[in-house]
Structures are given as structure tokens and as C-alpha cells.
Amino acid sequence: MRRTIILLVGLLLCLHTQAQMHSYDTSFTYSQQNFVDTIPIEVVDDQIYIMGTVGGHPCRFNLDTGSSQGSLYMGSRVQGLRSLGNVVSRDAAGNLDTVAVVELPSLTLGKLTIDHYVASVFQREKPRYTYDAILGFDLLNKGLCCKIDARQGWMILTDRRDYFDHEPGVGLHYRLKWFVPYVLVSPFKRHTDEVLFDTGSRQLFTMNKESFDVHAYKSKNVESQVEERVNGSFTIGQLGAERPSEVVFMKLDRLKWDTFSFKSVRAMTTQGASRIGASILRYGTVTINGFRRKIFFQPYEGGDSVEVNNKTYTIAYVPGRDGRPVVGLLTKSSDEYRAGLRQGDTIMAIDGKAVASFQDFQRYPFVEGQTYTLTVRGQNGMERQVPFTR
């Protein structure tokens, strides 16, 4: 099935600088010790959601291990926030900016109450979100272990460092960079790549473009796994879109997690960090041990490999200079390209209704399978109409 990307929101890394007014810390507290709790989760569109409360009110959290700390958006229904100042933050597209930092009221996850949890506050990039706040990797880095089973719909959370020691699984040590976990995987034979384990990213694997270039320089085997090259941009972080550059689409023979192989993996390059994303949970459980700094993968079906044969994005829309949606990335193999859409086209109207902003485009009530007429302005300034099937 064709995949269309409207927005990718990912990595939030709080940087320690001389000018910051609030630094990374894990001074929040847990209400329990020596506990084990099984908490229901939802995994929707390769994102992990947990129901809890903040200040006694229901709250839907998104668990994002690629975010160093919690975050929420201006206008969130979360109330009772206490300002802590500002911090310099870097997003998935590599943008830097100063953002507000707040302390949340007491929040609960299952039986656990967490006090003094800190979150960054960002401008809304979408008119609405399917969650109220993000829980970052600091939740585990503080000293917790968790096991996530998307198939069963639960997460086991514990502060017992040895609780999962005797469970099966293929483990990788991680090291913290900017307070988030990086592991070593092998995308090509005799090659390793340092990747962020990022449940805020949907795709199984994306590779940093500079890392790809190094791999390709060292081995002709890398180029044989390239399907297409396109100039454009597709990642939008909390602070803006990445700059246009070459994006490489690949079909990897295998992606190795230590001794386990994901076979026939489609992936693409990005200007941000290489990442393993939340769709790894389609194929097995993940256990994160915040004490031993290890991440374990256990395939649902056992064995030492799984056939992935996934699809990747073929088109991406990003905000243009005038605020309208622009085709930031488009492959020649896509239905949109065959219909006449071109990279750099600005979306001016949908079925004759003007699109004044990127948010208008995001809000449009598209129906899956229905065909629309887009009025687009090409890079030559000329307008034309293109059929578009959602």
C-alpha cells in the first residue's frame, strides 16, 4: 500500500550549553520501590501510547525513547504547569532553538506516581495530536526497566534491575549521547552503524546520509542495494523542516541486530541521526534495562531472522516559505509522480478550496481512496491541476 508522509516529528535533544537556564536532570521521584507493574498500551501507526493521569486528569502519553525528556505542545489540555525557565533544544531536522521548560503536576502510569517530571514546551506543528504529552527516555534512564509487547498490548515496568535477566532475547549495549540510547547495528556486511533507538520514529530503519556515504565509499556492495536517489527533504522536527538534500532509497539485504537478521528492509537516508524506529515492535518484544544499559529484542515467532519486505514513503510535504504545503520529496515510482505532481510544487487549492497554510492541508478531511483535484503552482510560477488519490 502506498505510504504518504505528512509530518515526521522525532528527536528532541536537550543540549547542555553555557547559556541555558535549565539543564537536563532526573530529579523527579517515584512513589514506589521494588515494584513490578503491567500497564496497558496502545500501538497505533507504529507509535506507543499509554493512558495515565496528570494532576488527577486523564492524559494520553506517547512514549518516545528518542526524546531525552518529556515534552508537550502549547495549548495542551495539561494544566497546573510550573515554569522552570528555558533550555536549548535540537530537533529531528537538526534545528536549534530556545524553548520553555515546565514541571508537570503529579502524573501516574499504572500504580506508579511520578512527581516533579520536567517537559519542554513546543509550538504546535499540527492542528491536533492523538496524545497530550510525550514521555522521554529520562523515565527509564532514571533507573527503570521495561518490556514492551505490542502484540499483547502491555508494558511491564519495574525498578528491579535483575527482573528480566533470565528472559530470552538478543541484547545490545547502548551508550547515551545527549541522554538518549545509541546502539550498533549492521546494515551491510562487514559494516556497522551507530543508531538511535527511537520509538518516536515510525520506520524500522533510517540512515544518516553522511554515514551512508562512508559505507558506500568503502564497499561496492552498498550501491547494489540502492533503489533510487532523489533530491528533497522530508523530515520536519519540532522547530522546522530539514534543508533539501539528496535522499537515498535502499532495499537492504539484511539489517542485523547482533545475531538476529531483519531481511529485505526498505530504508531511506536522513540528515538526522540513523535510527531504529518503533515498527521493530511489529516483529518482537523489546526490553530496555536502564540499569545495565542494554536493549533486548525477542522475535514473536522465534528463530534468528524475519522477512520484513516493508514499504517506505514515496512523497513528503513540508511547509514552504509562504507557509503553504510544498512537495518536499517525490519518487518517480510514486502514483503522485505519474499523475503529474512534481517536487517543489506548492499546493494552492484542493477541489477549488484555497489552501492558505500547511495547517489547512493537514486539517483537510481527506477520505482514503477518494480522488481530489489539486491546484498546484510549479517552480516556474505556472499553475496547473493534478488528480490526487489519498
Where are these regions (language model features)?
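Bacterial Sec-dependent N-terminal signal peptides
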Residues: M1-Y24
